[in-house]
Design a protein with these regions (language model features):
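Conserved beta-strand-loop-alpha-helix junction that forms the acyl-donor binding cleft
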Residues: 112-123
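Active-site beta-strand termini and strand-to-loop segments that position acidic
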Residues: 52-53, 146-148
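Conserved catalytic-core motifs of GNAT/GCN5-like acyltransferases
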Residues: 114-115, 127-145
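Conserved GNAT acetyl-CoA-binding A-motif
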Residues: 104-114
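Active-site acidic-Proline motif in GNAT/NAT acetyltransferases
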Residues: 82-84, 88, 117-118
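Residues forming the Rossmann-fold NAD(P)(H) cofactor-binding site
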Residues: 92
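Acetyl-CoA-dependent GNAT
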Residues: 2, 7-77, 82-84, 95-97, ...
Length: 149
């Protein structure tokens, strides 16, 4: 069994909508339907399904950080693993694949994420990959960054 990433297309977007998070997690992550809908208005958003072989288990969205005037930075906006598949290492493998994919992009030298204050699990998760806290934004979210050459 192998984790892989797939582009979100007309053929698989409903699979992403069917993925679920716990009620508690709803305060930390947007619904996949909202993230996919937003990407239709921002063509530079990249949506990926996280699959275990051919079974959808999660979703990730990232994009060049044009909104903050940082075109050389990729912002990972959404990462979720379905409740039935959490705690199995799929998120760790998926983020490793995404980081490798992003590092291949020309002109990109940083990756950032944000998490809602109090979501210590997310902070610890990204610290394992070398991200460090850089600021607290006006929305009470903590910004973490990873810089590379």
């Amino acid at each position: 069994m192998k984790i892989n990433l797939r582009d979100i297309t007309q053929a698989n977007w409903l699979d992403m909508i069917d993925l679920e998070i716990t009620k508690e997690q709803e305060k930390f992550v947007a619904l996949n339907s909202e993230a996919i809908a937003a990407s239709k208005f921002y063509p530079y958003y990249i949506n990926k399904g996280i699959y275990l072989d051919d079974m959808p288990v999660g979703f990730i969205q990232y994009y060049p950080n044009y909104d903050d005037g940082k075109p050389n930075e990729i912002f990972i906006d959404q990462l979720m693993i379905d409740t039935k598949h959490q705690g199995k290492g799929y998120g760790t493998k998926a983020i490793s694949l995404v980081l490798d994919e992003i590092k291949q992009l020309k002109g990109i030298n940083a990756i950032s994420i944000c998490y809602v204050e109090g979501h210590d699990v997310m902070r610890a998760f990204f610290e394992r990959f070398g991200f460090s806290v850089v600021e607290q934004d006006e929305f009470d979210e903590t910004i973490m960054e990873l810089h590379y050459a």
